[in-house]
């Protein structure tokens, strides 16, 4: 079971994290039911996240809701875990019944999955969002609209369930209130519990290099790693204009040490005299690496030192770093040599 969760948790993180330059906080709960699971796979799993950090787990093998973050264990009393353990045991049975019903409707046998995701987000400007949806075999099935108190159904089977659920107005209003009020209240509480982890900032280390990916094809890579939170914006520009259509992006992946990594690349025309630059924005700091054709690598290291920002640049060939910060931050940049 431990090996399965070690696989599932990073997978969910990859699905959650998006390229963005705005910092948001989220609380999400994922539930997964499996019919005829293979050996070692529980028939029911529930995982809770704050941002990209797992905070709780439950499965049909242990049948116990348990903390996944030390600050959750330290701040919530034993009766909290027991109360929600009992609730999740009920959800486990409900998922089993609902999955069997769906298989009958679709005339399916064998192994299938039924999933639920519920949660909320607290945006930088103080506004909030909430979401609740179900999936069958990994495909959207029912999606809740809290503003209209209705469900969006994707097929005839889902429409049958939609009509039954929409007949219960009390339950629809309860879900809306939970998404808009209770979920946000829990999120704020968890952010306070884990503030040393969840609200910290670690700036990215950025490197630009070129590589011959195929004979006659040169690719420019811009790679960022060691950053937290995972929200980051990265793009390539040609002569000051973004070249989105030509770019490939890597997923924002956990590095295994509590930080994240990602990359952006595009194929370079070796005969071109254009000026290319990689733009990275993270937590209000904007970095631009301009890459002349003859440069092969331009590593950039950004570290916070005594309240200021220190950039360390190593140039192979000729490169230019253009650095801009938000107007409210007036500290200068200090350039230091590094060994080869």
Swiss-Prot record:
Binding positions for 5-(2-oxoethylideneamino)-6-(D-ribitylamino)uracil per the UniProt entry: 31, 46, 65, 116, 174-175
Bilayer-spanning residue ranges: 303-323
Keyword annotations: Cell membrane, Disulfide bond, Endoplasmic reticulum, Endosome, Glycoprotein, Golgi apparatus, Immunity, Immunoglobulin domain, Innate immunity, Membrane, MHC I, Signal, Transmembrane, Transmembrane helix
Membrane disposition: Single-pass type I membrane protein
A GO CC term assigned to this protein in UniProt: Golgi membrane
Ranges of the Extracellular topological domain: 23-302
Region: Alpha-1, residue numbers: 23-109
Signal sequence, start to end: 1-22
UniProt binding sites for 2-amino-4-oxopteridine-6-carbaldehyde: 65
Binding site for 8-(9H-purin-6-yl)-2-oxa-8-azabicyclo[3.3.1]nona-3,6-diene-4,6-dicarbaldehyde: 29, 31, 65, 80, 116
Region (Connecting peptide): 294-302
Predominant place of localization: membrane
Chain residue ranges for the region called Antigen-binding cleft: 23-201
Assembly with partners or alone: Heterotrimer that consists of MR1, B2M and metabolite antigen. Major classes of metabolite ligands presented by MR1 include riboflavin-related antigens, pyrimidines and ribityl lumazines, nucleobase adducts and folate derivatives. Forms reversible covalent Schiff base complexes with microbial pyrimidine-based metabolite, which serves as a molecular switch triggering complete folding, stable association with B2M and translocation of the ternary complex from endoplasmic reticulum to the plasma membrane. Alternatively, forms non-Schiff base complexes with ribityl lumazines.
PANTHER family assigned to the protein according to its UniProt record, in alphabetical order: MAJOR HISTOCOMPATIBILITY COMPLEX CLASS I-RELATED GENE PROTEIN, MHC CLASS I-RELATED
This protein's name: Major histocompatibility complex class I-related gene protein
Encoding gene, per UniProt annotation: MR1
